[in-house]
């Protein structure tokens, strides 16, 4: 959060640049730009730009008082004017190139403000030496997967070339840094390296496609089951019947896979590294439906807010258009739904979903405070934090409920979230359930948005189904 950021800033012995994040007094909390002059006299101007998505990608409760300027064009043009005497101007952006981040991507920045010579980008973890249409945008991925190189000609004072160099196991490392890192690794291994369980199945840690940000996963099922189980151990504190208690966590918070074999505490903390605590919020069925609609607005494209669930069965009509409000949610880059077009809640704990009923949603404190697309949760007037972290809940669930073994029940997603890509198939129609079930079982596929056919020659069993 902001408090931690301020503390870190006092320890930094280097420039941190960001032109579009302001404090309560309306002034940038960082230096906006900086000019570096090389030994050969080339003046390189840098300015920083943070994604406005940080308003909901970070826990909103931890960044109160900060304002994120969404007018990338105006901010960039101001910086270009300040750096107009420099030979080369480079934007250091944390914007990314994902479609779900529009209109705040590095493409949007480059196209909006003329005069940027190069963009060094982050946020989407993309690996690219140039943009899709040749834009001078470079991104090195994540976790030091690559080193980006830019070559500037001293004579012309222009960028001559740029490239990426992949870091491999045999790449030479700085000895002092490697030694310092190893001390930290050894300390973590000592504290969290003990085996506490085994897994008979691999739990999906991918983002997309076919990952935690664009569909149901067995990892999401396990985590939300654990969250729900943990709260139900002390259900006396709940104000609704247990058949009205569900769990939701954002797929973007699931960061790694669990392999077959021994499972350590370190493995679980790698899957859930943020230290989020479990909160319980009370919402109406209408508010729950809004949260699901908003958090799947771009699916089948990936989105960090994708709702992994327990106790809920829902269908996403991916062929339907998201009916967005004209204005974004407060302090957000996301648009809430004007109407519900894409999501249908099929059941809650096997029973009929009722829009006017009150439901207890077990979620993480990030979503409860309105992180990602969950403004409907932030608006809840009744909520409480259990103080239990997600990783501890998962470890307790595996140890006590699963008896230390993640078994075949988690070999595959359990069919809680269904996809309906057909524009002319409504969940409420007499044939809707049958078509959607056949599609999600892999028996049929769409040949267009309105027609379908078997994927292969059908067996009698498949045909009769």
Q: What is the meaning of each model-derived region?
A:
Residues 50-55, 366-369, 443:
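Short connector loops/turns at beta-strand edges and beta->alpha or beta->beta junctions
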Residues 122, 283, 441:
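Single, functionally critical "micro-switch" positions that shape active/binding sites
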Residues 1-170, 214, 219-229, 237-240, ...:
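Acidic, metal/ion-coordinating pockets
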Residues 44, 89, 184, 188, ...:
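Extracellular/luminal Pro/Thr/Ser-rich low-complexity repeat and linker "mucin-like" segments
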Residues 57-63, 79, 141-419:
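Catalytic centers of hydrolytic enzymes
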Residues 420-465:
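Extracytoplasmic Gram-positive cell-surface binding/anchoring modules and repeats
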């Amino acid at each position: 959060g902001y408090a931690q950021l301020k503390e870190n800033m006092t320890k930094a012995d280097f420039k941190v640049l960001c032109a579009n994040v302001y404090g309560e007094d309306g002034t940038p909390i960082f230096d906006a730009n900086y000019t570096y002059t090389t030994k050969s006299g080339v003046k390189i101007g840098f300015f920083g730009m943070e994604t406005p998505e940080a308003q909901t990608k970070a826990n909103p409760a931890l960044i109160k008082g900060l304002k994120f300027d969404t007018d990338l064009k105006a901010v960039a043009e101001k910086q270009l004017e300040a750096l107009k005497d420099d030979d080369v101007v480079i934007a250091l952006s944390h914007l990314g190139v994902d479609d779900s981040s529009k209109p705040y991507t590095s493409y949007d920045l480059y196209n909006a403000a003329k005069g940027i010579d190069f963009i060094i980008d982050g946020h989407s973890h993309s690996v690219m030496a140039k943009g899709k249409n040749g834009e001078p945008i470079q991104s090195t991925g994540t976790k030091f997967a690559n080193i980006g190189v830019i070559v500037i000609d001293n004579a012309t004072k222009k960028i001559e070339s740029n490239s990426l160099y992949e870091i491999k196991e045999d790449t030479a490392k700085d000895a002092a840094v490697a030694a310092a890192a190893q001390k930290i690794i050894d300390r973590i291994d000592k504290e969290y390296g003990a085996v506490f369980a085994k897994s008979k199945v691999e739990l999906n840690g991918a983002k997309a496609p076919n990952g935690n940000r664009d569909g149901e996963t067995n990892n999401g099922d396990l985590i939300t089951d654990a969250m729900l189980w943990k709260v139900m151990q002390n259900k006396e504190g709940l104000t609704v019947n247990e058949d009205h208690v569900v769990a939701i966590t954002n797929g973007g918070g699931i960061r790694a896979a669990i392999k077959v074999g021994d499972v350590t505490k370190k493995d679980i903390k790698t899957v859930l590294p943020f230290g989020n605590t479990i909160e319980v919020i009370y919402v109406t069925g209408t508010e729950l439906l809004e949260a699901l609609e908003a958090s799947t607005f771009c699916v089948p494209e990936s989105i960090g807010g994708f709702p992994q669930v327990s106790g809920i069965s829902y269908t996403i009509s991916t062929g339907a258009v998201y009916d967005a409000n004209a204005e974004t949610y407060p302090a957000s880059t996301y648009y809430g739904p004007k109407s519900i077009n894409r999501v249908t809640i099929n059941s809650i704990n096997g029973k009929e979903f009722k829009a006017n009923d009150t439901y207890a949603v077990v979620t993480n404190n990030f979503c409860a405070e309105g992180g990602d697309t969950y403004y409907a949760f932030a608006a809840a007037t009744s909520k409480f934090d259990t103080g239990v972290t997600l990783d501890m809940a998962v470890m307790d669930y595996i140890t006590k409920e699963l008896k230390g073994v993640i078994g075949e029940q988690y070999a595959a997603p359990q069919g809680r979230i269904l996809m309906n890509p057909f524009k002319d198939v409504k969940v409420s129609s007499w044939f809707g359930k049958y078509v959607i079930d056949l599609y999600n079982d892999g028996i049929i596929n769409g040949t267009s948005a309105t027609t379908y056919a078997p994927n292969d020659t059908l067996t009698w069993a498949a045909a009769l189904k």
